[in-house]
């Protein structure tokens, strides 16, 4: 009887998942394995269910590599939330006859995979294929996580369309961009689309207030107005909400602060662009003016997009590498994560990305001291020190804000500071 390899997907969707499933299935079958697709991540495994699976054939997967979404669906169920659920998961996998397990997911799924591998005590060899459109896993040599490049490509087109609409209708757009703790997607999209301003969580300190974030946006709007323009697009990393005080967020009418099974804030339930829009509108109302702002959130539109060639090529290599590792190539580790380093497949131990202080996966954040960030910032419209140090410019900006020059300088100086 052929040995069994199981595949499951955890976390949010990302372009390229089906390509991984396809390449894993084809390589595994070509090496004599039976491939079992497990539906809905760990959801049914933690309940002991063995019927939510499908035997995959090459015919099932031969053309899915160009499609978005996941034929196995996905879920955020965390099998490592307790000793009982972890043990149940391992026992269910054993009942299914799974000897090899391929997990596809982000940092939470990687953590779950490592715990399953550890609990199985060598009976199930586990390999994790890291994915997230947030690009926040610290892969070697700064390689992107699969799905990121497609997400940036699709989102850039959307933001470019909004920029054209902004110019045509003489209004501002506040665009919240997916990215829990890191601003890679927001910055990449803003830079590629030449958005008026992009703000990301990495540029703010912990506990940043709504007022301080609004100062940055308001400063950009005023400077743009001084240049004769009442239009613009601000790309806003949703992870900024993670930097804010949850109590302040909870006190905003209409905002519900909840956490997911992994303990993260449900950022999708926090309408950051709307919150910032209303706060800026209140400022302008206090000045006796009206400003036209449209709030947009971009995220779900990207996750199941058809992958661009970069992500298809990348994921086929990752899927192939995952199977080769399980069959004994590359490393003798009982489990690990597959990645590409310098064009070559490499297996890293699960703890390679672990933060010893937290016991959780490290997060790759935007390096705000890098040339990449500095270049992006150079092409934004935002207040700079020279604007506030030049008496003539300062006076004009203060007049627009209906403030005294020194009052304006004191309030907005913090927005000119580089992180």
Curated annotation (Swiss-Prot):
A Gene Ontology biological process term: fructose 6-phosphate metabolic process
Catalytic activity: beta-D-fructose 6-phosphate + diphosphate = beta-D-fructose 1,6-bisphosphate + phosphate + H(+)
Cofactor needs: Mg(2+); Co(2+); Mn(2+); Ni(2+)
SUPFAM superfamilies reported for this sequence: Phosphofructokinase
Regulation of catalytic or functional activity: Non-allosteric.
GO molecular function: 6-phosphofructokinase activity; diphosphate-fructose-6-phosphate 1-phosphotransferase activity; metal ion binding; phosphofructokinase activity
Keyword Protein biosynthesis recorded: no
Keywords recorded for this protein, A-Z: Cytoplasm, Glycolysis, Kinase, Magnesium, Metal-binding, Transferase
Major place of residence: cytoplasm
Pathway: Carbohydrate degradation; glycolysis; D-glyceraldehyde 3-phosphate and glycerone phosphate from D-glucose: step 3/4
Subcellular location: Cytoplasm
Binding site for substrate: 132-134, 178-180, 238, 300-303
Presence of keyword Kinase: yes
Binding positions for Mg(2+) per the UniProt entry: 107
Cofactor annotation remark: Mg(2+) can be partially replaced by Co(2+), Mn(2+) and Ni(2+).
Noted pH dependence of activity: Optimum pH is 5.6-5.8 for the forward reaction, and 5.6-6.8 for the reverse reaction.
Binding site for diphosphate: 12
A GO CC term attached to the entry: cytoplasm
PANTHER family: PYROPHOSPHATE--FRUCTOSE 6-PHOSPHATE 1-PHOSPHOTRANSFERASE, PYROPHOSPHATE--FRUCTOSE 6-PHOSPHATE 1-PHOSPHOTRANSFERASE SUBUNIT BETA 2
Functional description taken from the UniProt entry: Catalyzes the phosphorylation of D-fructose 6-phosphate, the first committing step of glycolysis. Uses inorganic phosphate (PPi) as phosphoryl donor instead of ATP like common ATP-dependent phosphofructokinases (ATP-PFKs), which renders the reaction reversible, and can thus function both in glycolysis and gluconeogenesis. Consistently, PPi-PFK can replace the enzymes of both the forward (ATP-PFK) and reverse (fructose-bisphosphatase (FBPase)) reactions.
Subunit structure: Homodimer.
Assigned protein family: Belongs to the phosphofructokinase type A (PFKA) family. PPi-dependent PFK group II subfamily. Clade 'Short' sub-subfamily.
This protein's name: Pyrophosphate--fructose 6-phosphate 1-phosphotransferase
Organism: Thermotoga maritima (strain ATCC 43589 / DSM 3109 / JCM 10099 / NBRC 100826 / MSB8)
Gene symbol of the encoding locus: pfp
